[in-house]
Amino acid sequence: GVNGKVNYDTLSRVNTFAHVNHSADQTRLGVLLCINGVGILNSWVKRNVAPEGISYPALNELAATVPIGSEGLSILPFGNGAERMLQNKQVDCSIHGLNFNIHNKAHIARAAQEGIVFSFKYGMDIMNEMGIDIGVIRAGNANLFLSPIFRDALAGVTGTVIELYDTNGAVG
């Protein structure tokens, strides 16, 4: 997010920095939400759970066969080391509510994306505590934002509008 006033999270759960548009006359501070491990969860599911050789679009189609809520399966996506937004705790990734008689690869694919969405929501709540009102998410048309499941869940859970741009993080 970009903020027009000087503030920060006292627990350093998000990173505040001078935005490229910042000047002495106009305060423009960026606030960066770092969620360590969320993208890697989706790629881990693709490599280790989904059928071999599956593409990301096909993985999204597989996940779409499962209803919202993954029939009670949930995944906390923090499996790539300490999490800044969790005060540098290493909580690891965990799967909850797994029922061997109900859940399959499709459920895991959907639950992973839903877990990532809720980690975003948690981080956005931190930003809201700082006075940043997030009504629009502007993102590159890349990575998880290519997934309709992810986009729809993120918009629904956060109450935001998602605007996609023909760019990716490499462009800046």
Go through each PLM region and give its residues:
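Active-site core segments that coordinate phosphate-bearing ligands/cofactors
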Residues: 1-172
